């Protein structure tokens, strides 16, 4: 055998060099590196070691020997089957057997001596079967006979090794016999150890009995002695525990008193869960789930139930119920007793309404003698302003509403919180869409109208036209026998403004407006916003009571303490009476415009009620989303394609503007493109808005607000673009364009040419060839065609050939003759028309 290096051997055996070196070292072959060579002798030694390891199979068999009672002894038999010479096996067997027998005899004699040295204890031991071997091994250990000489075991059974018989699985008698002898020795030693263990337990019980009885056995309790004797009798001569002899049970004739089921009164609130209902009825949730299943409702323990379903479950399970009044706290807190207060006359609350750019703010500006219009972008009022004006005949509170169509909800709120509506109509424009809408809101709120025909100073002004148009909409002037006062005014020159104020005060006298000037204040939120350094700021119109600085107030889902109050001129005030607009600071958040404002004496109750309202809003929103998902699922069934979503983050200067823009943008949604406003708020654009825009791939829109420096830096890093607007028209138009870009283009067919068949020829190569005259447009070889007969489409396909005389042509223009071969169609007749068209993509528009 040729010499080989360690590295070559490792490569041939697919082993690592280090692992091979360790294996060689374990076989007694010392090598240090992969370059060392292996001699033929070393290779032979290595092969013998490997073969001897492979030819040895260790087998382990575990059986259990039962002692009397509940105890078992596990017998583990290990044997090795080795393929070797017979002589070696016989010699090893001959040498090992005498030594093993002598060792076993010595160990057995030692164990017997240990047992003989134990203390003599009186015990009556019955002769029982000592050891039972498993039935499959078919061997037994003979029963020993021990003399009754107290508790001391005077003789041990002689265990003969020849009596242990085992099955020979592999036919190797010598190795099996050797393993069986070892197993018998182990069984015997374990039996002796067990006996010794129980002797120790007996001594411990004896000592415990002595302690219980005092100094000696004589003073022991007889009951304890009998119990100890019973314990000692439970062991046999091998120390194995006997089976317990149970005394026969004496049957007693007893009468079980019937227990009446507890009937509970369960308080049920809307949206109660299965687990809550189960807890109130003191039953498991699974039982209620079973009842629901029998009713045909699949539910889990966390499922919310409506009150009707919960009532059925409670009655089904035999309990009583009471319905929880969720408005109990709100009624207790918000209802104010004013029976002890007197009413006084108050100033009228007047809302100026009308179409865009008809001069509402200019008219109010003239009345207030200030210049507010210059601050509004494009001369359009972006949010509601509340102002108090004092005249010679009394005070008037004005609410200015935007005229744009997006601010419908604002006008609706303005109509609800007002006493008189001044409808401004431009004399040169007449009645416009928002004018009609203002009339509808005023009539719905049952508020009297005073019409101000504005811009009367213009040459093209026509007040009679305005009167006739309004009369068609049931706004009848007093001169025509109606109840509506018409006043011609000019916000530019001030003409007729005094007459308008006099008409308003006259109307208020007719209405006999009164309010409580004392007690806890009530009002309505006209506008709200978030100002840097001041926090949430709300413009509130007080309707009843006296609002004072330091009062605990509740506005919708927000609460707080009035830290400061300012009037419409920006001056700090300590108190505000009915029909007074004020700005208040100190709320926990920005309330929604139109929320009711109430003063609550207990701040804790205000906080609790605000949390309850917030929870109701969340539950209503979740329920609405679930119903929308369900309806959308049915509506979208059968529709192909996926709906595109334009995600928007909207930030504005005031709550009313944000709400109005939100409603306008949501109305733009179609079946193909949906507007999803994932976040909206008041104040500057912050870095959190940018992070949200990056995570959700949304567009950030700011209305009359800008991004702070941190947001700008983050936007430059993440590539987020801000869109700033100060006029609502531009914002809505840009969003429409963005939505149009998300629309999938529409495929449209356009006819580019028509050829009339004049004669038909037969060709062996192409079949029927139509001799045609192009009567319209151009016929192109590559475009699809239709064959028309009597203006009815009879075939649609493509051209196989287009020839001008004998030459192939790519296209033939109007007025020229050509030969046309239609692919896979031979039924061309004279008088047919071949229509050539093309498919083009057309961008969709909203």
Swiss-Prot record:
Region of interest (Disordered), ranges: 198-219
Annotated region (G4), positions in chain: 454-457
Domain tr-type G, residue spans: 345-512
GO CC list: cytosol
Chain spans, region G2: 379-383
Keywords: Cytoplasm, GTP-binding, Initiation factor, Nucleotide-binding, Protein biosynthesis
Reported function: One of the essential components for the initiation of protein synthesis. Protects formylmethionyl-tRNA from spontaneous hydrolysis and promotes its binding to the 30S ribosomal subunits. Also involved in the hydrolysis of GTP during the formation of the 70S ribosomal complex.
Protein name: Translation initiation factor IF-2
